[in-house]
Structure formats: C-alpha cells, structure tokens
Regions:
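Well-ordered alpha-helical scaffold segments within catalytic/enzyme domains
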Residues: 2-15, 64-82, 125-139, 196-211
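Conserved catalytic-core motifs characterized by acidic clusters
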Residues: 40-48, 109, 171-177
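Solvent-exposed loop and edge beta-strand segments that line ligand/cofactor-binding
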Residues: 48-67, 78, 82, 86, ...
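CBM-like carbohydrate-recognition segments
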Residues: 113, 117-118, 124-242
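Flexible, glycine- and charge-enriched loops at secondary-structure boundaries
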Residues: 16, 20, 83, 87, ...
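Loop-centered beta-sheet repeat module
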Residues: 17-70
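Long, well-ordered core segments of solenoidal/helical folds
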Residues: 20-43, 87-105, 147-164, 221-234
C-alpha cells in the first residue's frame, strides 16, 4: 500500500526519490477518485467501469485513508513539491470527520448516517491521527484537542476487564447498499481494533506531555502552557439569587 511504499524511503536511500514519488502518485490518484469534497470524506469504493460510484462513507475506510496521509506526511520532506497538496487533503478530511463525531465521542459506522452504530476501531484510528497531527503541528490543538480527548475517552471505555476491545466491526468489503454496513457484526476478536487502540493511547500520552488540557465549566480546553490555576475561566452559577 501507499504507507509501505512511503516507508521504503527510510530503508533504501538510493531509491528514496522513486519511492516517495510513487507513494505521492498513488495517494493523489486515490484521493482524486475517492474523496468527496462537499462532504470532506472518502467513499468506501470506486468502480472504474461505472459512471456513478457508491458513496458510502464507511468509518474504518476513512480511518485508513487518514492514517495513510499521516504516514506519508511523516516521511515527505518539508520542501517536497506535492507535500502541500497532500496536507490540503489531510486537513479537509480532518474537518469533514471531526464535524461528525457523536456526543459520546465515538464515530458512526457510516460516518454521515447517525442511525448506524457507533464503531470503536475507526474512532481509535482518528484519535491517533488527530493526536499525531497536533503533536506535529499540522492542525490546531485549540480546535482539535478537545475532539481528540473526547474520542480517546470513548475508546478507553470500550476496553473491558479482560483487556478486549469491544465494538469493532469485523472485516468489511465494499457494498452497494447501506444495510450491508448497518448490519456488519462487531466482535472482540476483530483484530482491526487492537493496533489502533495501542497507537491512539501512545500518541495521547505524547499529546498530554505537550499540551495542558483543563476543564472550563464542563468543556475541555487545550492550552500550550500550564495554567497557574485549575479554576475554570468561567462557570455557571447554580445558586439561586436571593432578593
């Protein structure tokens, strides 16, 4: 895949330029076909022989796309000619995905369909990517830190007493109807959830070493410097005023 090709640039210095060019070419061709600009999301599949393509925005597929962009940006030199274009796709995708986070912190199996179930593995991938992007300075901690924090809190709540990750969709191919995605089973033995949860946890540790989240009333606010007080900037006065 694209990530593997990009990573090869680390190990074969003589062929580094070739591998980077191929990884970027694949990413941009993928995005050109799969990214839906008006949604800020990736479709799950694309059929070359069809004029109309399925537009089901499966959560974990969007996770893999976001993770691929992260891994590509990690290895592309700052002055690489097409780095800015890859970054533009990444940031547009971040905006599209974060706008659809549920109030519980998880994301839905079909991202833009709130009646589809909440899914753990995709959420863990997003948490990793968002935390990583904040740590790298690609996106703003003030805007995206609280979303990331909420996502991690939700993911952590899906780890049961046996250390199993609950709520992970099993392997899923492309489909042409929504019911297929709605009724895909979840299973604690679906391995897709474990790696992302470990990655997300490790990146959150790094994030919390670099940023200083603080409760402000009932909202999480992210600060780049440690605050002198733990008292909220504002709070709701719940006491009744007496005449």
């Amino acid at each position: 895949g694209i990530s593997a090709v990009a990573q090869m640039s680390y190990y074969d210095k003589e062929q580094k330029d070739k591998y980077l060019a191929e990884a970027v070419r694949q990413f941009l061709q993928f995005a050109d076909r799969m990214f839906i600009p008006e949604k800020g999301l990736y479709r799950h599949g694309w059929v070359e022989s069809s004029s109309d393509h399925p537009a089901f925005c499966w959560a974990r597929a969007n996770g893999w796309a976001m993770l691929t962009a992260c891994e590509l940006l990690d290895v592309l030199p700052e002055d690489y000619p097409q780095r800015a274009k890859v970054m533009d796709y990444f940031r547009a995708h971040v905006r599209g995905v974060t706008a659809l986070q549920s109030g519980e912190g998880l994301w839905h199996q079909l991202l833009d369909r709130n009646d589809s179930y909440l899914e753990t593995s995709a959420t863990a991938i997003y948490v990793y990517c968002l935390a990583h992007a904040i740590n790298k300075g690609w996106i703003d901690a003030i805007a995206y830190g609280p979303v990331t924090h909420l996502g991690w809190h939700a993911v952590a709540g899906k780890i049961n007493a046996e250390g199993q990750v609950e709520g992970t969709c099993v392997g899923t191919g492309m489909a042409f109807d929504p019911a297929f995605y709605y009724y895909r089973p979840v299973n604690v033995y679906a391995a897709h959830g474990y790696g992302p949860v470990l990655w997300a946890g490790a990146e959150m540790i790094r994030l919390l070493k670099n940023q200083y989240p603080q409760m402000n009333d009932s909202a999480v606010q992210y600060y780049q410097v440690k605050q002198k007080t733990t008292a909220p900037i504002f709070a709701i006065d719940t006491e009744e005023k007496k005449d």
